[in-house]
């Protein structure tokens, strides 16, 4: 349908990756670590889907900047993982705060959710980065230059 060089194909791959990853991971964090009710978390994820659709491709380009910088520093895998973590945390945390405010989470819940998300992102390594790489391959995004770990 779209050529492998299509920017739309790239945007669709990035959007798919972000919606799926953020829905699963953040719901687990909100319910099991932050003390939000299932209903609050469900509504948070519903609000997050259109937000994730809007920010997915800009985030993908933002992450690609971190990957290019990491490649210049070192070809090692731990630099790529660190760049993935920094890109994710610095881009997603402010967006996550806004989503939680919209759904009525209080400041204690917001701080718990965002800080837990940061810690989980660090503990999980660069899982989202690997998932994004996988989705880009799945959608056959040809212009994408993967940094090998």
From Swiss-Prot:
Subcellular localization(s) per the UniProt record: Cell inner membrane
Keyword Ubl conjugation carried by entry: no
Annotated membrane topology: Multi-pass membrane protein
Gene Ontology BP, a term: L-alanine transport
Gene name per UniProt: alaE
Protein name from the UniProt record: L-alanine exporter AlaE
One Pfam family from the record: AlaE
Cellular component terms per the entry's GO annotation: plasma membrane
Keyword vocabulary terms for this entry: Amino-acid transport, Cell inner membrane, Cell membrane, Membrane, Transmembrane, Transmembrane helix, Transport
Chain's role: Exports L-alanine.
Disruption outcome: Mutants show a significant accumulation of intracellular L-alanine and a reduction in the L-alanine export rate.
SS bonds (residue pairs): none
Organism expressing this protein natively: Escherichia coli (strain K12)
């Amino acid at each position: 349908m779209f050529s492998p060089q299509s920017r739309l194909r790239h945007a669709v791959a990035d959007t798919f990756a972000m919606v799926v990853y953020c829905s699963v991971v953040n719901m687990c964090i909100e319910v099991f670590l932050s003390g939000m009710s299932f209903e609050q978390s469900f509504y948070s994820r519903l609000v997050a889907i259109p937000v994730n659709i809007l920010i997915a491709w800009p985030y993908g380009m933002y992450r690609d900047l971190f990957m290019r910088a990491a490649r210049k520093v070192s070809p090692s895998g731990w630099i790529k993982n660190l760049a993935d973590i920094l890109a994710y945390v610095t881009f997603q945390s402010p967006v996550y705060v806004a989503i939680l405010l919209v759904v009525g989470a209080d400041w204690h819940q917001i701080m718990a959710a965002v800080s837990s998300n940061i810690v989980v992102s660090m503990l999980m390594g660069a899982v989202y980065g690997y998932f994004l790489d996988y989705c880009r391959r799945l959608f056959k995004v040809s212009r994408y230059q993967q940094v090998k770990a």
